[in-house]
Structure formats: C-alpha cells, structure tokens
Amino acid sequence: MVSGPLALRWCPWAGHRDMGPDMELPSHSKQLLLQLNQQRAKGFLCDVIIMVENSIFRAHKNVLAASSIYFKSLVLHDNLINLDTDMVSSTVFQQILDFIYTGKLLPSDQPSEPNFSTLLTAASYLQLPELAALCRRKLKRAGKPFGPGRVGTAGIGRPTRSQRLSTASVIQARFPGLVDVRKGHPAPQELPQAKGSDDELFLGTSTQESTHGLGLGGPAGGEMGLGGCSTSTNGSSGGCEQELGLDLSKKSPPLPPTTPGPHLTPEDPAQLSDSQRESPAPTSTSALPVGNSASFVELGATPEEPMDVEGAEENHLSLLEGQGGQPRKSLRHSARKKDWNKKEPVAGSPFDRRETGSKGSCPGEEGEGTGDRVPNGVLASSAGGGGPSASYGEQSFPCKEEEENGKDGSEDSGQSGSEGGSGHTGAHYVYRQEGYETVSYGDNVYVCIPCAKGFPSSEQLNAHVETHTEEELFIKEEGAYETGSGGAEEEAEDLSTPSAAYTADSRPFKCSVCEKTYKDPATLRQHEKTHWLTRPFPCNICGKMFTQRGTMTRHMRSHLGLKPFACDECGMRFTRQYRLTEHMRVHSGEKPYECQLCGGKFTQQRNLISHLRMHTSPS
C-alpha cells in the first residue's frame, strides 16, 4: 500500500492547489441550459403556466424565479400566471422566454426599433435588468430615445386573482397569420414609477414566506434578474420552428439524444456581477444546434447575426444554484384501482385503469378537437373569427369535472392524472418523452363504465351489464310495487325476481351512515369517504377542497386545459379515459349495449340504462 509523499504523487487531486481547470468542464452551463430548454419544449416537469393574451406557455418555476424577481414572487403560490397585455404581448414574451432558457437574443422578423422598444418595456415590467440593459444599448446605438430609468409597472393593469384563474377551453395552434395586436404601435417610451408594485410582488404571500420576499421589494430592475429575448417564431409550416409553450399536439416531435456534461461544483458567484456590466454584447455566428433545441430560424430564411449576452449562460447556472431550492414537484400521481359508486348501489370488483399513452383533443368534453399538429406555444381561441382558427369556435370553460364529481365523487383517492402510465411523466402532461412505452389494455378492451371492469368480448360485457341493469330495475320496481302502480309491474317482474336473492346474498357490507350495502369492503370505504366532513385536498388554483386526490387532479385539468387521453383516429382529447373508450366506438361503429326487451343497441351504457327505464316506467 502506498503512503507518504508517494501517495500524493499518485493522487495529485488530493490537494486544493491541484484542483484547477482540469477539473472543470467549460460546456457544463451550456449543457444544463440546453437540457432545461429541451425539457421545456417537451413540457417535461413544467409546473407553471403563463398566459399572455390568448397564448399559453409552460415553464419551470425554478428557472423563472432564478431569472426574474417579479416571477420569483408570483410562482410561490400561483401555478397559472396571467401577464398584463398592455405591458407584454405574446410574441414578445415568446422571445423573452426563449432568452431566459438559452441566454441568446436572436433577431426577429419585426423592425428593430419597435421591437427593442417593446422588449425594453416588457423587460422592465418583468424585472429583467440584463435584457433591459441590452435593449437600451441597441436603442442608444441606433440613436433612438428611451426612458432614462427603469420603469416599475408591476402593478399596472394587473388582473385580479379571479381573472387570472380563467382560461379558454379550446386550445388551438398558432397560425402563420397571427400578428401582435400591438404591432405598428410603438411602446411607451417612459412609464411612471408604480407605487403599488410591492403589492404585486407580495400578492398572496403567506407569513411563512413573507420574510423570503422582503429583500425583493426594490425597484423594478432588481439586482439578480436575468432575462432577454430570442427570435420571434411565427408558426411556419416547416416544423423546424417551435414555440416553446404548452404542447397540446397529438404527437410530439422526437427528442434527439444529447449527452449532458458531468455535474460540477457551483461556479463562482462573482460571474453574476461580471455579466451585469453594461458593456457591448459580443456577437457570435452560431446559435444553438437545431437538433438539440428548439430551432430559432425560419426555414429558408437567412438569420441575422445572433447576439449573446455576456456570460449569460454561466449566470443562468449560477442563479439556478444560488436560489438554493429545487422546482416544486407537480401533483403526485400514482396508479390506483378505480371504483365507480353511483346513487344506487352498483359496483363490481375494481379494475386497473391504465393509461394508453395516446394523445389528442377532447371534444367538450366531446365537442372540441385539434386536427393539426400544435407547436409548443399554443393559442386559446378568442372571440374573433376568421382565418383557419375560426373553424374551432369558442366555448366557455366550465369545470366539467365538478359535474362528474356528482356522479363518481367516491372514486379512489389515489387515482390521479397518471392512472398508471409511464414512470417518465404524469398523465396530466400531454407529451411523450423519449423511450416512452405505450401501455395497452390487453384483451380487456370492453370496459363497463360504472365499475370499470374489463372484458375481452362484447358478449361478456353485455352479460355483465345485465347484472347492473337488473339490480337497478329491482330497486326501482320495488318502490313501484309499494305504491301500487301498475302497468309495467308485470313486465319488470322477471328482471326483478332473480335480483332480489342476488342482492341479498352478494351485498354484505353496509354503510353505517346511510345503510347502503356493497359487495366488498373496498367499495364501502370509498362510499364512506363521501360522508367525511374534512376535505384534505385543495385545488392550488382556485382553492376548492376535495375529499380525494384523484378528483382534485381532474378538477385542476379544467383550469389548465389539460386533456391527456386522445383518439388516434381523429385527435379528439378527453380528460377521462373512459370517455375515450366510449368515443372510440364512434369510429368502430360498435354498439355493445343491447336492450333485452326490444333489441335496441347503444354505444354507451348510460344510454341503455335510460332506455330500460323507459320500458319500466308507468305509462
């Protein structure tokens, strides 16, 4: 065994003096930014949505908090942020968000003066001092006037919390004809200092985190903001250009493999001060590789010389590590078994609901759809018609999950958006990651809606459905006999007679509150949860409380417009997988539910049950 001075000769890294450049990887910060930008493009681990005008952008809270003091104060409690359209447009914010994730400012298709003036206004509003300094330098070189100081307009035109919670229901692609509503109107050259900006900064903060934000209440141009803009994408049909917002496309573009640099120790914080010197920005003739990140140049277009903010990429890494925190995890999703409890005791053995991994659009839930591939920045339809987007129309976005809560309010609390999908991402994301494997139903493709039980053939499903129907008819007709009603009594007698013995023997578990009976204890426990007074699962957006995590997760999809289950045939999206199963029968023409009295066939079980009630109701 080697010891003494010889050991140091074999281990030169044992002393601090030897830990020099050989132990650093200069491209580590670039690799980190590249990976973060790719994750944003795919929507992976994105935990905040920013709405600007009618455009939706997904991002990471940690990255926004490390780049802007303004965002840092908002993402503490909000998962949905609505920016003031008087201060920033969707096109400008696309450039700013690209810059935050790349550290590069590429030329846009707009004239230089209005674009930089607008960027300066938006950068001051979002408290991005580096971008503001860069815009001032560009305007100064061009001899254009600009505001002498940094504007602080954090509270001007800010919508209320209730306004921020509203989102449009129809998610559409951004078409090439879309233009900025503020295009052609120069941005205000100087805005008054906002006295109420602190109210905006600390809106909704709790006492626990108020001390964390007290040091942030300076002027709009904070000490540690980092921002900027990159090219303005216009949704060209070439597919090379991407808008890195929420990807609601049916298929996601493949993500080329990249080799991230090895992890290194945090860089020297002194880089931050170096990058904030208002010195002329050096130019570079190369942008990020097209294969490894979102492309910033139109197909067939010759890009102008890109601009780099000095040390921006290194500062991105320093700021991310300097925040001392990790991104908030999105809602936990775990695959649990699903039981359907209706008003009448109808239940079967649980059946594992599994995600098929397909993607598409939900039609209202069955009236909406997106047939085209949607870029990563998406447009929620507005009231204006015309153009390709007019075919989609506009609908209000009620919380339809709340209506479903009345039908299946006792679903398993462990059920959530993922419902057993891939381990790479939760099912409330609508994008595929590299290596994602689709999970199929196997042979049990015929699913009973109330109890979620699967069967390999429609005949077996019909036989199973009859047990539900007989039980419901027995309960209904039992009340009819007691009231002395005639007419359909004799007709329903054949159905109700065998169900009486069946229900007496197969439902030994009784609820202690309402005395309803169930087949198994698991279903009974789910029913008993409906009687609980406590609601431990709140919605992070509107604050509504739920007794079960799965119900709360589906409710949040209404706010975020996320519909993870899609039809491969037409691209329609659904928030619930059983609705996708029902919808697929529209394409196949299958009607597995048949009335035993008249022979009528139906695609959905609830239609059959309603039809049978017509037979048994007194005429």
Curated annotation (Swiss-Prot):
Positions of modified residues (Phosphoserine): S166, S169, S197, S349, S416
Region of interest: Binding to CtBP: 247-249
Chain ranges of zinc fingers (C2H2-type): 446-468, 509-531, 537-559, 565-587, 593-615
InterPro entries: BTB/POZ_dom, SKP1/BTB/POZ_sf, Znf_C2H2_sf, Znf_C2H2_type
Annotated Gly residues bias: 214-228
Region span, Disordered: 180-293, 307-426
Superkingdom field: Eukaryota
Biased composition (Polar residues): 281-293
Record's subcellular location: Nucleus
Keyword annotations from UniProtKB, A to Z: DNA-binding, Metal-binding, Nucleus, Phosphoprotein, Repeat, Repressor, Transcription, Transcription regulation, Zinc, Zinc-finger
Annotated function: Transcriptional repressor.
A Pfam family hit: BTB
CDD domains listed in its UniProt record: BTB_POZ_ZBTB30_HIC2 (cd18334)
Chief localization: nucleus
A cellular component annotation (GO) from this entry: nucleus
Domain BTB per the UniProt entry, residue ranges: 46-109
A molecular function GO annotation: zinc ion binding
Keyword DNA-binding annotated: yes
Quaternary structure, from the entry: Self-associates. Interacts with HIC1.
Similarity comment text for this entry: Belongs to the krueppel C2H2-type zinc-finger protein family. Hic subfamily.
Species per Swiss-Prot/TrEMBL record: Mus musculus (Mouse)
Compositional bias (Basic and acidic residues): 337-357
The protein's name: Hypermethylated in cancer 2 protein
